[in-house]
């Protein structure tokens, strides 16, 4: 009888102590404490999450309008699977975006709303959120910043979302090189903060059958990941020059940290989806390019990648004259 009572007393004491401590902190410290508990190295601990939410709600109560607190509350609610409150706090954060101290924070809010729209199959909302990210957090030079900084395509003037030159280079038949090789030899994309937006746009455009846009955004995402890996390799070997994806993959594998970083990305999933969209694009005129891209995955992806088997199946179906699925 004494032990349950003692545990209850201790728990109550901790709660009272916590509430008294909360009262002493200014709102910005409450926000930071809540954020630290959410992203704690201990991982998901329900008690920590409850305390974090208390901190954040108190910070919001004190400041009144606090989009950062709304965002972190949305993260907390996503961790317990409460999509309704997650979305509500994200919408509130977006509504009060003008009060954000760090304007780039808006990108996280928009991307989270796009992910919820994906779950709800609201494709138009998803595309709108992602395009707003591109509109606010990228500029035209992000897409041209290699050989074609000066010599831009005429039809892209004043329209940074026209990235058709990525598609043209990928589909171009050049002897002795793959589509991805040729594209990466022409372009770099180092606005790493929006690679995920391009990746998600590629995914939704493929889902609705907009294959040209699916390929294009997928290529930007793939080139962005390769650009980052190229930067890492160049740190160790300043004179290194990219020749083709096969030799570059071998070079990446020479450095454990770069290899681990590369394998933590969704690169091979992106490339697989590029190939899939290519197969269906323009009434199947580029099936051979799709198959070549799947062959790259079979040859270069790490052995644990599920996209090796998927690519083999697609290649086999193509050779047998079956429809790709």
Regions found by a protein language model. Give the residues of each.
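Canonical tetratricopeptide repeat
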Residues: 72, 105-108, 112, 145-149, ...
């Amino acid at each position: 009888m004494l032990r349950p009572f003692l545990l209850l007393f201790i728990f109550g004491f901790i709660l009272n102590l916590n509430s008294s401590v909360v009262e002493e902190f200014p709102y910005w410290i409450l926000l930071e404490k809540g954020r630290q508990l959410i992203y704690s190295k201990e991982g998901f601990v329900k008690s920590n999450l409850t305390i974090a939410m208390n901190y954040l709600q108190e910070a919001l109560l004190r400041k009144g309008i606090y989009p950062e607190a709304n965002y972190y509350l949305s993260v907390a609610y996503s961790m317990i699977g409460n999509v309704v409150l997650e979305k509500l706090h994200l919408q509130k954060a977006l509504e009060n975006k003008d009060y954000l101290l760090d304007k780039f924070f808006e990108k996280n809010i928009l991307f989270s709303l796009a992910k919820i729209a994906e779950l709800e199959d609201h494709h138009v909302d998803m595309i709108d959120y992602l395009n707003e990210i591109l509109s606010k957090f990228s500029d035209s030079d992000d897409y041209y910043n290699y050989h074609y900084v000066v010599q831009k395509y005429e039809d892209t003037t004043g329209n940074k979302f026209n990235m058709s030159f990525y598609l043209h280079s990928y589909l171009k038949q050049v002897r002795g090189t793959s589509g991805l090789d040729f594209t990466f030899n022409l372009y770099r994309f180092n606005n790493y903060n929006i690679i995920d937006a391009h990746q998600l746009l590629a995914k939704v455009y493929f889902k609705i059958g907009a294959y040209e846009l699916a390929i294009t955004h997928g290529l930007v995402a793939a080139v962005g990941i390769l650009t980052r890996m190229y930067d890492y390799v160049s740190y160790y070997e300043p004179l290194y020059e990219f020749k083709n994806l096969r030799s570059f993959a071998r070079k990446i594998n020479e450095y454990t940290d770069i290899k681990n970083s590369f394998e933590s990305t969704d690169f091979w999933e992106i490339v697989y989806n590029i190939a899939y969209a290519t197969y269906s694009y323009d009434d199947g005129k580029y099936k051979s390019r799709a198959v070549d891209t799947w062959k790259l995955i079979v040859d270069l992806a790490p052995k644990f990648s599920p996209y090796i088997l998927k690519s083999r199946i697609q290649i086999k179906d193509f050779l047998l004259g079956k429809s790709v699925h």
